[in-house]
């Protein structure tokens, strides 16, 4: 067999091929190492991100633990979420929580109800001032502060004119560092409700200006007669105020003109609001309140419905001339003096015989206050509040089995374990000695303001 002879040119080609394969292998190994390093870095970074996310969630849970209610949500959401958990039964099946809540609610209402007869200004002029700044976009009140306050303000207008029919109200909003008048001072509740519904669609913007709002309220209350009280109710949600000048001068002018200011705070306490309430209420700091939840906000609005007691610093007494007009019925429409519109019927002023549409109002011709006797009676109950009914003890022998007012049988709530009554469910008037159920008790004190037992007594002539 002949030997194989390899030329020099073939050897050179083999060397070049081996060198190229080696370089490609080295290059591939380098790229593989780089890819492995990149994968390891990405894997480690994802682990770090995951650990940071877990730590943030743990910190958030720890920080929100104090804000959580019994049902796992926020504390202010316990009122609505899983409300059926509030009614619980014990081992014997008694609805202990339900009875306890009724008794507790009554005790709370009785403790807060002030039955001391004070001299109060029943002819009121109130300026309702609402914060419509960016702070009202907070959602600690559902769905947010702005929507909640507008709804509660509408309810407040209804209740205010129901309990104070011969009073007047105006509405101001604070927005973009300015004060805007949305409803003139008048005694027509529908005008104020329509104005509140219109600003419900507006988005809160900017910062509030407490000084501008107080100056506008002062200007609206200047023409008010001396026999009327001058009040300003402010709903303030921000923690600061953007004022164009010295607000302390505005406070001094409010004090000199006997304008009393009450502030309902939605956030933390603000020093200038505390100073404002203290200066305008003869040193009383209790007129600045900070709400706790939605129920507390409703209670604060209800407190503002009751007229303020007249301070001893105020001078003397004022006799107010009032007119009781007669109702007229017409077959053809005639012009009224209050709106200059054609209307059927109305009321004739007994002083100048001008025609007005509705009551109560002030005659646009002679400035005489025109009211009905029922309006005066509804305002009078603030001066002489009805006494609180006393709960009948369970150990006493009951006089009757039916409520004197609604004629319904009193409920019997016993403990199945020992057979004792949990509560008598009877509340007695100290004057007429008649007994009422809890529903009639609440209705009599909050709406009727007259005891049916006392009113049904025969009049001795």
Curated annotation (Swiss-Prot):
A zinc finger (C4-type) spans 349-366. Residues 53-63 have a biased composition (Basic residues). It is found in: Nucleus. Gene3D superfamilies: von Willebrand factor, type A domain, Zinc/RING finger domain, C3HC4 (zinc finger). Transmembrane segments: none annotated. Keywords: DNA damage, DNA repair, Metal-binding, Nucleus, Transcription, Transcription regulation, Zinc, Zinc-finger. Residues 125-304 form the VWFA domain. SUPFAM superfamilies: Cysteine-rich domain, vWA-like. Its main location: nucleus. Residues 1-70 are annotated as: Disordered. InterPro entries: C1-like_sf (IPR046349), Ssl1-like (IPR007198), TFIIH_C1-like_dom (IPR004595), TFIIH_SSL1/p44 (IPR012170), VWF_A (IPR002035), vWFA_dom_sf (IPR036465), Znf_C2H2_type (IPR013087), Znf_RING/FYVE/PHD (IPR013083). Residues 26-37 have a biased composition (Basic and acidic residues). One of its GO terms (cellular component) is nucleotide-excision repair factor 3 complex. One of its GO terms (molecular function) is zinc ion binding. It holds the Pfam family C1_4. One of its GO terms (biological process) is transcription by RNA polymerase II. Belongs to the GTF2H2 family. Component of the 7-subunit TFIIH core complex composed of XPB/SSL2, XPD/RAD3, SSL1, TFB1, TFB2, TFB4 and TFB5, which is active in NER. The core complex associates with the 3-subunit CTD-kinase module TFIIK composed of CCL1, KIN28 and TFB3 to form the 10-subunit holoenzyme (holo-TFIIH) active in transcription. An additionnal subunit, TFB6, plays a role in the dissociation of the SSL2 helicase from TFIIH after transcription initiation. NCBIfam families: ssl1. Present with 2340 molecules/cell in log phase SD medium. Component of the general transcription and DNA repair factor IIH (TFIIH) core complex, which is involved in general and transcription-coupled nucleotide excision repair (NER) of damaged DNA and, when complexed to TFIIK, in RNA transcription by RNA polymerase II. In NER, TFIIH acts by opening DNA around the lesion to allow the excision of the damaged oligonucleotide and its replacement by a new DNA fragment. In transcription, TFIIH has an essential role in transcription initiation. This is General transcription and DNA repair factor IIH subunit SSL1. It comes from Saccharomyces cerevisiae (strain ATCC 204508 / S288c) (Baker's yeast).
